[in-house]
Amino acid sequence: MKSATSAQRPYQEVGAMIRDLIIKTPYNPGERLPPEREIAEMLDVTRTVVREALIMLEIKGLVEVRRGAGIYVLDNSGSQNTDSPDANVCNDAGPFELLQARQLLESNIAEFAALQATREDIVKMRQALQLEERELASSAPGSSESGDMQFHLAIAEATHNSMLVELFRQSWQWRENNPMWIQLHSHLDDSLYRKEWLGDHKQILAALIKKDARAAKLAMWQHLENVKQRLLEFSNVDDIYFDGYLFDSWPLDKVDA
């Protein structure tokens, strides 16, 4: 496998392998592919990379991922190019790669913000949480998540470092415009995860109010770890009870070392 900095990312290489498997076997439209776990073993890669490759193939219309039912072939013509889901380099990363970058960036932003935040900054964070609560209470499917974005942005702005704010804005924009993230996010039930993540946000805010930099860093890290695990759970196509432990993560004690 090539490195993530080569012309192709790992999930793109694996996507091409799965496409070749569909063509050469061959699997006809409507037929079910082997389970994600078997594909990972067959190609000697992690299930996370296979999962991202399947999302890419789903975007391109080659397969359909049915949660709890399996992976089904839609097109076996081989006419689709799997090099990239989008020509824009900002959209070229897989969703879990984006999450890992956010985890590294935003945990350190939260740590610094705990030392820099003013009273006005805390007020902005509280207002963002209130907006989140109103959006959650509306219970409308696909309702706005602007409160979520405003909360994370308020933390970045509390560093009073314009470069950190810009880095945050860019990472969020990449997420919003990333077709693989959008595809994965579409499999989620908003009401289930947004309530959990609102609770995470309250823990982060509590640490920031106390100016506890270590607690703020760890709370943000754990929040994005929870996001990652929820996405892994909901993106699994073999077992609806999969708990997401196959994605490598750093323990909290390593983060704070």
From Swiss-Prot:
Pfam families: FCD, GntR. One of its GO terms (biological process) is DNA-templated transcription. Transmembrane segments: none annotated. Gene3D superfamilies: GntR ligand-binding domain-like, Winged helix-like DNA-binding domain superfamily/Winged helix DNA-binding domain. Residues 36-55 bind DNA. GO terms for molecular function: DNA binding; DNA-binding transcription factor activity. PROSITE patterns: HTH_GNTR. Residues 8-76 form the HTH gntR-type domain. It comes from the Bacteria. Keywords: DNA-binding, Repressor, Transcription, Transcription regulation. NCBIfam families: PRK10225.1. Repressor for the uxuRBA operon. This is Uxu operon transcriptional regulator. It comes from Escherichia coli (strain K12). The lineage of its organism: Bacteria, Pseudomonadati, Pseudomonadota, Gammaproteobacteria, Enterobacterales.
